[in-house]
Amino acid sequence: MTTAVLDLDFNQLPPVITGLEGYSYALILIRLARRPVGQVRLPVIDGEISGLELRHALIETADAAFWKHWMYHQLGWEQANPTGAASPTATVAVCTRDRPDDVRRCLETLMRLPDDGQEILVVDNCPSTDATKRIVQEFSRVRYVVEPRPGLNNARNRALVEARHDVIAFADDDASPDPGWLRALLRNYDHPLTLCVNGLTMPLELETEAQALFERYISFMRGFEYKVFDEAFRNPLSVGRCGVGANMSVRRSLLTCVGPFDEALDVGTPTRSGGDNEMFARILAAGYRIIYDPAALSWHRHRTSMAELQRQLHGYGIGNFATWTHHLFIDGELGALKEAGLAIDRRLEELSASLRREPNRIPLNIITAILLGYALGPWAYALSRRRFRTRSWRL
């Protein structure tokens, strides 16, 4: 049951959307003056979607964020950078490991960004071949460095050290940033306490069952409302609302303000994930700001096969409990025990629904993979802490 992913402007909605033969549904991103303001999911009938049906669905599903964007647009107000201060210059960092084809697609997209003097840096993490290096050599504007120690957070820290500009915008190698992505991120750095700005992540495609399941069950989408997280947002266990590492930017001074990314967390280590959320929690605990701006849009290509999805969500399960282990034993956050218990309860409810074969259930193998990840998470974090002794990263 494939889903078409469409991108339409609110003021230019067509009377009918055609050419959707072979699709059962369409996920439609709605923009207003190029800014993402909402999304609608509609069934496809005979390869078409009625424009009238789309308009009705949009009005019915429009939330407060949509109408806020609409009013800002009508009044000609800007939601970010109200001071008019000049935006900083950025280094766009692509951290990758043995995925040269993804790197090529990502770099081709980055070449279409407006040239505002940004640097593009590929950090090749513990590569097994020189395939990625050879791909990068095809792009004269791209700089290539190797981080020999495995782990995404090692690669992120290497990017912070190597960057030549004040802000580092991280783009996943399987992502395709929108042309306005970088400018939208950078215009939010007008306040000195803003240490991190994250953007909206939408699915690039939903062509397979695995991709559709990921978007329905996990999703990187954090909504269409512009948000500022600061000292008033004190729950380090709810930082997932701040954004995702697939569409994240930070000041280079992060290293001196709050320290490097935790090398014991995320892809390439036994913990498999969690590095972004741990950093978000640390930034807020230190009294700095995180901004979520949905205008900073990036399209992400989800895993295409169920086997890949199962491995990914198993890793997310490990990473969740590894991060909560960090919060409990390193930060002294007793609330991590409550969060872990709630997560287990939710998965057990989903397991029960799967066993009863309820409609729209999560496949049994996915639920069991996540639960197994939960069980392994604390041990994975302990192993990772012993294996990866944090280096002294300096600017």
What are the functions of these language-model segments?
Residues 180-217:
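Conserved donor NDP-sugar-binding/catalytic core segment of glycosyltransferases
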Residues 108-117:
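Short, acidic, metal-binding catalytic loop of nucleotide-sugar glycosyltransferases
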Residues 314-318, 332-395:
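Non-catalytic, C-terminal membrane-associated alpha-helical segments of glycosyltransferases
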Residues 242-259, 264-296:
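A short, conserved alpha-helix in the catalytic core of glycosyltransferases
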Residues 109, 124-133, 175:
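A conserved acidic beta->alpha catalytic loop
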Residues 168:
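Short aromatic/hydrophobic "clamp" motif used to bind/position activated sugar donors
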Residues 199, 218-240:
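Short, flexible, basic/aromatic active-site loop/helix in glycosyltransferases
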